[in-house]
C-alpha cells in the first residue's frame, strides 16, 4: 500500500537519480495533505497512517544507499511525520456479553466481531482466514496457522472452543467467514453496537484492543498476550497493560471514607 501511494505521487515514474531531499519533503507534504485512502471511502489518510507510509519510504531510501543505488544517505537527512497518540477504546467483558446477546443485521458480522474479541485477529486477517489454516492439535484443541496481512508475520495461534463455534460449520476448505464484507464494518456495525446500548465509539479494530485488555485484566502475562497479538515487540503490548492499570487506579479511587 505504501508503494502504491508513492506510485500515485510520482505518476508511476521515478528514477533513483531523481531521489532528492526536496522530493522527499514534497512526498511528505503529499501524504499529509493530499493522499487519499485506497478504500473503503477514499478518505484523507490519517496522520499515523501517513507517518507509517513515510517511514517505509525512508527505509527504502536507506536500503538504496546501502546498496549504492543512490550516492547520498537521504533517509538520515529527512525528518518524519509525528504520530498522534490515539486513545485505544475497548469493551468490558460485560459489554462484550451485551453484544453477544444483541441481534445484528448480518450474522456473519456478529460472528466475526466476537471472534476478534476472542482471538485478537485484525479484520484484514479475519477476511482472508481459510479453513485450510485451521487444524486440530494433538491435545484435541484447535490452532490456526496464519500469515498476518499487516506485518506479514507467520504465527500459530490457539482457538478456543467458543471461538471455533463462531466460525460456523467446520469445512475442509474455503473462506471461514464467507459473505463478510468491509462495508459491513461501517454503518451495520455501528447500528449493532448502538442497539446493544453501548455508547462508546467502537470500530472493528477495537475488538482487538478488547481481546488484549481483557486477557491482561484476567491475568494472562504480557509476553503471552504479545505473542497472541503477533507483536514484534512487547513494548507495543505494554500499552494495553497501562490501560488496565489506569482502570484499576480509577476503581481504587471510587471507594472513599471521606
Where are each of the predicted segments found?
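N-terminal DNA-binding recognition helix of tyrosine site-specific recombinases/integrases
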Residues: 2-25, 33-76, 122-124, 191
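Conserved tyrosine-mediated DNA breakage-rejoining catalytic core shared by Y-recombinases
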Residues: 18, 77-80, 86-89, 93-94, ...
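Basic, Lys/Arg- and aromatic-enriched nucleic-acid-binding interface segment
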Residues: 43-47, 51-53, 66, 70-123, ...
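C-terminal catalytic core of tyrosine-transesterase DNA break-rejoin enzymes
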Residues: 66, 114, 118, 125, ...
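Catalytic-site neighborhood detector that most strongly recognizes the C-terminal catalytic loop/helix
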Residues: 90, 148-152, 182, 229-254
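DNA/chromatin major-groove-contacting recognition/catalytic segments
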Residues: 98, 155-158, 169, 242-258
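Short, polar N-cap/turn motifs at the start of nucleic acid-interacting alpha helices
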Residues: 133-140, 199-200, 220-239, 246, ...
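Active-site/catalytic core of tyrosine-dependent DNA strand-transfer enzymes
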Residues: 160-199
